[in-house]
C-alpha cells in the first residue's frame, strides 16, 4: 500500500514533529433509537516521541478516544491525520495494513493466547506480517530480553505474574517496530508496584527507541512520569498540560 494514494488529503501547517492530528473529532453511538455522543469535537495533536497520558474518570470517553487514535474505529465527525495523511481516505484494506505497520497495542487484559508460550505470543504479529520463522523467533527473543523476560520465553501466560504478562504484551507491541504504541489502562489489573514498573518500562522504551506512547489511566500517580497529560471529562478535553 502506498500512502501517496491520490485520494489522500493533507492538512496545512502541520509541524514536522506532528505524528497524529485530530480535527473536530466526534464519536456517536446509538442506544436503541437514542444517540449517545461519547466524544465532542476533539481537537489536538500528538507529537513524534511523546509520552502522553489521557486521564479522567470512568465513562469520560478515554477508551473511545484510544480506539480512534489507534485507527480501530472511525470518527462519526471530523478527521484524523496520521503523519499528514487523512486516514478517512483509506480503504478498509489500506487502513488495516497501515495500522499493522505503524501502531502497536497494549491491552489492560493482556490479550495473550493462553496455549502459546511468551515467545510464541510475541512472534504472532510478526507471522501475521509475513516475517519468516527464524527471523520472527530472533526478533521475538530479543524483544523479550529487552523487557527482562529472557528466562521466561517458553512459559505460558498462566505461569507468569500479572506484571510479567504485561511485559510480554509490551514486547509484542514493540516487536513490529511501530511508530505509535496505544495502551488502554495498561496498569488497571496490576498492583501499585507493578503499575509503576510497567510505566517506567514503557517510558524507557519511549526514550531509547523514540516510539510515541499514548496511554490511558485513572491513576493520578502515573502522571508524574509523562511528557504531557490530557484530561478528558464527559467526552471533552478539559485540560491539556505539558509536564516540567
Each model region followed by its residue ranges:
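ABC family nucleotide-binding domain
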Residues: 19-225, 229-232
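ABC-family P-loop ATPase nucleotide-binding domain
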Residues: 1-28, 239-244
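H-loop (His-switch) and adjacent beta-strand-loop-beta switch element
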Residues: 229-241
